[in-house]
Amino acid sequence: MNFKKLPKIELHCHLDGSLRVDTILDIAKKDNIHLPSYNKKELINYVSIMDDCNSLDEYLNKFFIPNKVMQTKENLKRIAFELLEDVAADNVKYIEVRFAPLLHVEKGLNIEEIIESVLEGIKEAEKLYDIKGNLILGCMRNMDIPSAFEVVKKGAKFIGKGVVAIDLCAGEEPHFPGKYIEVLKLAKECGYRITIHAGEAGVGENVLEAINLLNAERIGHGIYIKDCAEAYKLVKEKNIPLEVCPTSNLHTKAFESYETHPFMDFLKDGIKVTINTDNMTVSNTTITKELEMLNKFCGLSIGDYKILYLNAVEASFASSETKEVLKSYVKEITA
């Protein structure tokens, strides 16, 4: 089965986890940024999981170097453009890129300038390629609550101009949703759609709380609902889409193998699953690679993929017009 040729949708892709290594090197040399190595083969080890990784926290360490080169308008625009260029080459028709604006203020940019630069890169790529992109703003859970309010407030002016949603990301602690009730209440009032990283690192109850306390419309990862019957039931009853990222889940040691990943069980039970990369560079993956692995180890069929694709169309925060265009590609999903 040729997954490369199939139309695809990406709903969970972090900008700072998906840079070209060549671009990191190029910007570092141009802007005189120190890197541990200027040899591409060596640098890959610092920004990608090559052999082993023991936890989500260790996985997140791979973002330090990419963020060093994402501190100017020019660089942010370029990196956003290149991401859409890369996924368009993988036949991705629609992507929701997510990033945390406050990770890019080190050289004096303000939140509005940061968001605007990324949107410019997305829009430039849309003009050249058969792809549509939107932006999800991330609030870092390792920053204070006022920081989250700042992102929500300052990003609101871009809703309807490319920004579609708000997210909570970074390391996951039990019962984190309770801290962010007021932040997400404001986000909803501003008009943001809501997706929350939860149930990625062993705490299924966080999914329950993200839906009940934060009005999450989608869940990033959500795989640990398998250990929380109440969360599983709620996700199924409310038809809450899960943004599943299989290779990333293996890297963070959520699961030992593709065969033991619960993705196929979820799909067969009617959970609205979508398949995503999470971080193309950190996990050294593409949507095509994800599908190939699921086909090889889990028996993913063309019929299964059609369900996944339509799940992603429905789960997306795209406009109704864009969704209709995306649905039209279903006829291309053949073995």
UniProtKB/Swiss-Prot annotation:
GO terms for molecular function: 2'-deoxyadenosine deaminase activity; adenosine deaminase activity; zinc ion binding. Substrate binds at residues 14, 16. Gene3D superfamilies: Metal-dependent hydrolases. Its cofactor is Zn(2+). GO terms for cellular component: cytosol. The keyword Hydrolase applies. CDD domains: ADA. GO terms for biological process: adenosine catabolic process; hypoxanthine salvage; inosine biosynthetic process; nucleotide metabolic process; purine ribonucleoside monophosphate biosynthetic process. Pfam families: A_deaminase. The keyword Hydrolase applies. Its EC number is 3.5.4.4. Zn(2+) binds at residues 12, 14, 197, 278. Binds 1 zinc ion per subunit. Keywords: Hydrolase, Metal-binding, Nucleotide metabolism, Zinc. The active site is at 200 (proton donor). The record marks 221 as: Important for catalytic activity. It catalyses: adenosine + H2O + H(+) = inosine + NH4(+); 2'-deoxyadenosine + H2O + H(+) = 2'-deoxyinosine + NH4(+). Catalyzes the hydrolytic deamination of adenosine and 2-deoxyadenosine. Belongs to the metallo-dependent hydrolases superfamily. Adenosine and AMP deaminases family. Adenosine deaminase subfamily. This is Adenosine deaminase. It comes from Clostridium botulinum (strain Loch Maree / Type A3). The gene is add.
